[in-house]
Amino acid sequence: MPAAGLAVVALAYRATDVTHALQGYGHLVTRGEKQLTLGVVWESSLFDGRAPEGTVLLRAMVGGVRNPGCAELSPDTLAERATAEMTPLLGLRGEPLRRWVFRWPAAIPQYERGHIERVRRMRAAAARHPGLELCGTSYDGIAFSAAIAAADRLASRHATDAAGNGAGPSATLAAGSFANEGGGR
């Protein structure tokens, strides 16, 4: 499954060093802005307790298909670019108290033409192997909420199967029977 690289730059600031009110979830950066940053989540505004009292936590997503290769930039370069791009919009002053950089070379699945059919074929192949399931952002939606919904449907299906006949995927393994194994252990 093709995927674009992504870097996440998290920055902690004193609340007094951020002039923007940060009331909301964050912001997205349009393609026309020509920035490495795709968007910024205002973590401390969105989630209680995410940052100590008197501080804010900002999480910038950098790279994606818009800026391939960003995940390979040095952590210092990524943090400096993200900070420089956020500063005019959020009114950042001074240096962050702390910064973290996480890089994933294959983070965002790219749903190309034929994706639904490709996933259908993959799931049909997986169905021939009891207990093997495909779930996650590569299959049913790149948003975290889509991954949770798909996992919930999968778990519900397994719970229903197990309740209905007492033989979910773990029952097959407990019996020592594997598909295409030829009867041996």
Report the location of each language-model feature:
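Mid-domain catalytic core of redox enzymes
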Residues: 1-58, 65-72, 76, 88-89, ...
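Hydrophobic, well-ordered secondary-structure elements that form the walls
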Residues: 11, 40, 60, 86, ...
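Short FAD-binding loop at a beta-strand-to-alpha-helix junction that anchors the flavin cofactor
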Residues: 57-59, 123-142, 147-150
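Flavin (FAD/FMN) cofactor-binding core of flavoprotein oxidoreductases
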Residues: 67-68, 79-127
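A generic alpha-helix signature
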Residues: 73, 77-81, 146
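Active-site-proximal substrate-binding core of FAD-dependent oxidoreductases
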Residues: 101-103, 159-185
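Internal hydrophobic alpha-helix adjacent to the cofactor/substrate pocket in enzyme cavities
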Residues: 147-165
